[in-house]
């Protein structure tokens, strides 16, 4: 059994947490996040800690409590520090540039690709082959990075495409005659 739910979530100074039934709202310097948690989870606030536990008589309540604890912890980290995903472009002529509230990509198609950014997400291009995505919601930051990567995922022969900065693309050997 996982013991994630047994550890409380510490609420740092400058972070405000509101509990309204199963709805948790976390407000900090980077923004505000709200999430409705599963009904099988009991949430309690004790001074600067949030504790999670299972509701009696529910089969997978401990699993749901662990999930809820991880989600709320990510919310607290997001509103204090934020989350960042870095993408790199590899390939001849592959470029990225900011166009207002969208990322403009040149990825070898007959047309340029523009990816509009959702609210609360910021992106910057330190160079033509790098994109840095930041925001306070871990799920949305990861989804935007995955959407941009999906336009041209790294291919296995030369490794050309959009990849995460920490991603290791295994390349294959070309077919021999």
Swiss-Prot record:
Disulfide bonds: none annotated. One of its GO terms (biological process) is cytoplasmic translation. One of its GO terms (cellular component) is cytosolic large ribosomal subunit. InterPro entries: Ribosomal_uL6-like, Ribosomal_uL6-like_a/b-dom_sf, Ribosomal_uL6_a/b-dom, Ribosomal_uL6_bac-type, Ribosomal_uL6_CS. Keywords: Ribonucleoprotein, Ribosomal protein, RNA-binding, rRNA-binding. It holds the Pfam family Ribosomal_L6. GO terms for molecular function: rRNA binding; structural constituent of ribosome. This protein binds to the 23S rRNA, and is important in its secondary structure. It is located near the subunit interface in the base of the L7/L12 stalk, and near the tRNA binding site of the peptidyltransferase center. Part of the 50S ribosomal subunit. Belongs to the universal ribosomal protein uL6 family. NCBIfam families: L6_bact. This is Large ribosomal subunit protein uL6. The lineage of its organism: Bacteria, Pseudomonadati, Pseudomonadota, Gammaproteobacteria, Vibrionales. The gene is rplF.
């Amino acid at each position: 059994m996982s013991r994630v739910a047994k550890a409380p979530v510490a609420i740092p100074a400058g972070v405000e947490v509101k509990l309204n039934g199963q709805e948790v709202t976390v407000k900090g310097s980077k923004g505000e996040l709200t999430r409705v948690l599963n009904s099988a989870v009991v949430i309690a606030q004790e001074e600067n800690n949030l504790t999670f536990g299972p509701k009696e008589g529910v089969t997978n309540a401990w699993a749901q409590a662990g999930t809820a604890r991880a989600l709320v912890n990510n919310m607290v980290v997001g509103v204090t520090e934020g989350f960042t995903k870095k993408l790199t472009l590899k390939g001849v002529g592959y470029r990225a540039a900011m166009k207002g509230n969208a990322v403009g990509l040149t990825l070898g198609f007959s047309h340029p690709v523009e990816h509009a950014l959702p609210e609360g997400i910021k992106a910057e291009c330190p160079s033509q082959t790098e994109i840095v995505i930041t925001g306070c919601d871990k799920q949305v930051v990861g989804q935007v990075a995955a959407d941009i990567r999906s336009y041209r995922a790294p291919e296995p022969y030369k490794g050309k495409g959009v990849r995460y900065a920490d991603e290791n693309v295994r390349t294959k050997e070309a077919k021999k005659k």
